Amino acid sequence: MAHKKGASSSRNGRDSNAQRLGVKRFGGQLVKAGEIIVRQRGTHFHPGDLVGRGKDDTLFALAPGHVEFGRKRGRRVVNIVSADTERAEKAAVPA
């Protein structure tokens, strides 16, 4: 019988912290400038109108407005529809 524990027991016992990736603000939600919309590795979502991209591919709002998810040329795109744009669209549509 062995008088020692398994030799690898002290080499185990570590785990990496979660990266907390994913969508932080969903479609229709109101955001302020600078708020993070999506944390990602690689460009799963691409920046659209009024959305910036950080060096770690994080998408963030460049202006206040509502978040809008869509597709452009087969890519998933995140846009910000500003309050000014919404007002202009409502004024242009006859009631």
Curated annotation (Swiss-Prot):
The keyword Cytoplasm does not apply. One of its GO terms (molecular function) is structural constituent of ribosome. One of its GO terms (biological process) is translation. Disulfide bonds: none annotated. Keywords: Ribonucleoprotein, Ribosomal protein. Residues 7-19 have a biased composition (Polar residues). The keyword Ribosomal protein applies. GO terms for cellular component: cytosolic large ribosomal subunit. Residues 1-21 are annotated as: Disordered. It comes from the Bacteria. InterPro entries: Ribosomal_bL27, Ribosomal_bL27_CS. NCBIfam families: L27 (TIGR00062). Belongs to the bacterial ribosomal protein bL27 family. This is Large ribosomal subunit protein bL27. It comes from Parafrankia sp. (strain EAN1pec).
